[in-house]
Structures are given as structure tokens and as C-alpha cells.
């Protein structure tokens, strides 16, 4: 785990108590111990270094404590020599992160002055495939995911996005962010029609849209498209099983709202195409910067 996604912030004393599922995840799945260090992503997006201060197995709770005294408000200076509960903290204790930490990933992102925000218009596939797409898009740092009701979308797949499925997608996003260390607060929105999606994107400024096409007709070079102008937002539209119909390509490319791109590769599954397209665009933009 690169970071822990918290639903609330530390209190004025620099402590954060976690219960229930969070306790189970940290103590039973990750098996953290008192003194272990971990990065915590707060609701406001801030990344805070903390330590496991106290584990109460009877109450099924775990208390985290801020490591950086500068993060605690005036008059509430936190001593790292001792804690209000849980006893002694030793900052030399191990971190539970393996490899690159979330703070290192965040520093790299902050160094990029021309950071681009990514949006995915994903034509709704079968539920299991959508879960995989959401997971991979989150790991890649996509900000907004809009499920699109398309010509080839099955009615059952749209209905499946209601109720418990939405909660499951939020859980998938949280787990993907914790494992990848993504600083981006990825959101999955309610399903919308392709027409509504076009109207939404038309309102954007300094934005660019790309639709992945199975056909070579109307296709443009990805490099030329991304070199046209400086953009702050990029949207990638990806088809579901059956792809994007010619009628939908026409709607997206109308008024030059989206540019069609055909990759000269084998026919890709929709979940593969989404990851391939996101990675291709991000790689080019990173090289450009």
C-alpha cells in the first residue's frame, strides 16, 4: 500500500481514530504494528505522514498520529517522544510501504507545472469489465470517469450501475488509489447519453477530445493532435463491446469536438483499449512536457 485514503482528517491534537473496515484493513490485512509509518491522504487531498500510535483490539480501533509537528495548529504542539495514548513512538520504526512512496509520487506530480487533467468517456460495457476499466483508469490518474450509454450498451449493464454497484466502484477506486499512490481523487459519475457527454465537453475551455476508433477512416495522428495546442484537460472516449459506431464517431467529431484516432494494432478488448489509449496519451504528454 502506497497510501491510506482517510474519510476524515486529524483532530486538533494530531490524532486520527479509525474503526470497523479501516481497522480490519490496517490491522488484519496489512498487519500494521505500533510505530509503523504510513502516508495518509486526507479528504482535502493533502498527504500527511503519520505513525501507528495505538491499536486497541478490544475496541477494534487504531489511532494514527501526525509525524510532522508543523502540521499541528498553534497551541497544540505534538510531542513525538510520547503520546496521549498508546505509549512510546519510535520514528525509526519501519514503513509499511514497499518501493516508491506516495509522497515521492506526489513530488513528481507537483514538479510538473503543465499538469493535464484526464477524463474518460467509457461506453458502458458489461459490469465486470467496467470494474477493471475503473481500477486501471484510477491507477493511471484519470480524474473523471463518465459511463456513456451508447448504441451497443446493454440495458442490464446500465441498470447494474445503480445502488450497490456504485458503492462497489467507489471501493475499487479507494483500493486502486491506495495501491498506486495516486494523488488524483477519481470520480465515477452517473451514466449519461453520448449527446449529453458531447454537450458537457463542448463547454470546456483549453480542452481536447480523442475518440479511439477501430476504423482508419477520419483517423488522425495522435502526435499531431496533441501538438496542436496547449491544453489543460484531455478526454478519451472508448467504446464497449462492439466498439464505437460510425454514427457515434460522426457525433463526436462534429464541430471538431473530438479527433478520431486509430491505433494500428490488433483488435483490442474494450478494457484493454481504455488502458492502451490512456497510456498512449499520457506518455506523449509527459514527453512533450
Where do the protein language model's features map onto the residues?
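Short, ordered loop/turn segments at secondary-structure junctions
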Residues: 69, 149-153, 265
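RNA substrate-binding interface of SAM-dependent RNA methyltransferases
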Residues: 76-82, 88, 97, 105, ...
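Generic beta-sheet signal
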Residues: 118, 207-210, 232-238
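Short acidic/polar active-site loop segments enriched in Thr and Asp
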Residues: 143, 232, 258
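Short, acidic/turn-prone active-site loops that include or flank metal/cofactor-
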Residues: 217, 241-242, 265-268
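Structured adenosyl-cofactor binding patch, chiefly the S-adenosyl-L-methionine
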Residues: 246-289
Amino acid at each position: 500500500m502506497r497510501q491510506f485514503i482517510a474519510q476524515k482528517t486529524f483532530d486538533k491534537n494530531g490524532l486520527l481514530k479509525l474503526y470497523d473496515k479501516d481497522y480490519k484493513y490496517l490491522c488484519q490485512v496489512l498487519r500494521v504494528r505500533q510505530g509503523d509509518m504510513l502516508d495518509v491522504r486526507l479528504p482535502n487531498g493533502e498527504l500527511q505522514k503519520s505513525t501507528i500510535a495505538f491499536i486497541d483490539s478490544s475496541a477494534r480501533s487504531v489511532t494514527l498520529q501526525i509525524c510532522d509537528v508543523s502540521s499541528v495548529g498553534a497551541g497544540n504542539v505534538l510531542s513525538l517522544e510520547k503520546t496521549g495514548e498508546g505509549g512510546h513512538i519510535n520514528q525509526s520504526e519501519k514503513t509499511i510501504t514497499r518501493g516508491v512512496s506516495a509522497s515521492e509520487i506526489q513530488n513528481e506530480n507537483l514538479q510538473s507545472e503543465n499538469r493535464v487533467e484526464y477524463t474518460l468517456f467509457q461506453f458502458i460495457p458489461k459490469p465486470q469489465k467496467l470494474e477493471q476499466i475503473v481500477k486501471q483508469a484510477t491507477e493511471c490518474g484519470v480524474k473523471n470517469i463518465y459511463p456513456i450509454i451508447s448504441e451497443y450498451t446493454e440495458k442490464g449493464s446500465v441498470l447494474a450501475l445503480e445502488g450497490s454497484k456504485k458503492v462497489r466502484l467507489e471501493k475499487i477506486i479507494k483500493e486502486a488509489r491506495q495501491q498506486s499512490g495516486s494523488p488524483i481523487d477519481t470520480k465515477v459519475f452517473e451514466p449519461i447519453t453520448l449527446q449529453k457527454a458531447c454537450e458537457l465537453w463542448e463547454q470546456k475551455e483549453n480542452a481536447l477530445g480523442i475518440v479511439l476508433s477501430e476504423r482508419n477512416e477520419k483517423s488522425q495522428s495522435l502526435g499531431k493532435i496533441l501538438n496542436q495546442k496547449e491544453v489543460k484537460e484531455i478526454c478519451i472516449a472508448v467504446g464497449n463491446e462492439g466498439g464505437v459506431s460510425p454514427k457515434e464517431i460522426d457525433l463526436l467529431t462534429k464541430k471538431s469536438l473530438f479527433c478520431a484516432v486509430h491505433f494500428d494494432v490488433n483488435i483490442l478488448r474494450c478494457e484493454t483499449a481504455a488502458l492502451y489509449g490512456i497510456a498512449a496519451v499520457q506518455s506523449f504528454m509527459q514527453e512533450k512536457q
